Amino acid sequence: MLADSSQPSSFHHVTVLQRELVEGLLPDRGGWFLDATLGGGGHSELLLSEWPNTQVIGLDRDPAAIAASQTRLQLYSDRVQFQHVNFANYQPGDRRFQGIMADLGVSSPQLDEAERGFSFRQDAPLDMRMDPTAELTAAAIVNEWDETDLANLIYQYGEERLSRRIARRIVEQRPFERTLELSEAIAGAVPRSYRYGRIHPATRTFQALRIAVNGELDALQTFLDRAPDWLAPGGRIALISFHSLEDRIIKHALRGDDRLTVITRKPLLPSEAEIESNPRSRSAKLRIAERVLPES
């Protein structure tokens, strides 16, 4: 299903670990590849442009990303297909892929477009939905969940040690409808030393809300359970994560799956040059595994 109401020109995502990921899939073999988190299409563009014997199916839950990628990849329209779907719900049928790639987390355009409600630095409705057709919003969680559930959410998904203080302040001051209102309330709930630390005091709470709104960790686990069966023998899966919760799930899933052999004993990290040109790449980690060949 394709979106027709998005504005592709507003969706420009800087791809992280682009060549490391694509080359890690061994694209010289050609064949079909699955881009499970299409985003702005950067990884797929590199694959399609440098390996003409490849074809791509691109998935994304965000219709704005699909629209942007259709524009970016129009030179390869005979070799790429698009589906508006969460990768956890994808059904490949009988197709088997030589490679599967996923670049997880929120994209730069989603952060930068204030109206999406992902950023605590820009005023916007408390939304945070990657798929605008989904029902649950960040406002619903903040305004309707009880204090204990909020604290547990912020602790588990945000790894925030001050989760109880923050949840108490949210309940005391709600309802909240705007991102900056919530951000300021969180900042007021924490000690002054914490308020002016290395990261903004709302960072982890906003991460927790985003993960919950979009069901990110459940979707990732479902995808990791299913994706190895979508690979041809010897095919590879490459996954980029941006925080420890994702990376922990990926590491244990790849190591514990007898359908796969782990290629990267330790995750591949961005170079200093990439971090300097794109500071958001700093926390990225790339892990790669290969589908085990059937026993003869």
From Swiss-Prot:
Superkingdom, natural source: Bacteria
Name recorded for this polypeptide: Ribosomal RNA small subunit methyltransferase H
Organism of origin: Synechococcus elongatus (strain ATCC 33912 / PCC 7942 / FACHB-805)
Residues binding S-adenosyl-L-methionine: 41-43, 60, 87, 103, 110
Gene3D superfamilies on file: Putative methyltransferase TM0872, insert domain (1.10.150.170), Vaccinia Virus protein VP39 (3.40.50.150)
GO CC terms: cytoplasm
SUPFAM superfamilies: Putative methyltransferase TM0872, insert domain (SSF81799), S-adenosyl-L-methionine-dependent methyltransferases (SSF53335)
EC number: 2.1.1.199
Gene Ontology biological-process entries: rRNA base methylation
Gene Ontology molecular function terms on file: rRNA (cytosine-N4-)-methyltransferase activity
Recorded catalytic activity of this chain's protein: cytidine(1402) in 16S rRNA + S-adenosyl-L-methionine = N(4)-methylcytidine(1402) in 16S rRNA + S-adenosyl-L-homocysteine + H(+)
Cellular localization per UniProt: Cytoplasm
Keywords noted in UniProt: Cytoplasm, Methyltransferase, rRNA processing, S-adenosyl-L-methionine, Transferase
Summary of the function given for this chain in its UniProt record: Specifically methylates the N4 position of cytidine in position 1402 (C1402) of 16S rRNA.
Disulfide bonding pattern of the chain: none
Entry similarity comment: Belongs to the methyltransferase superfamily. RsmH family.
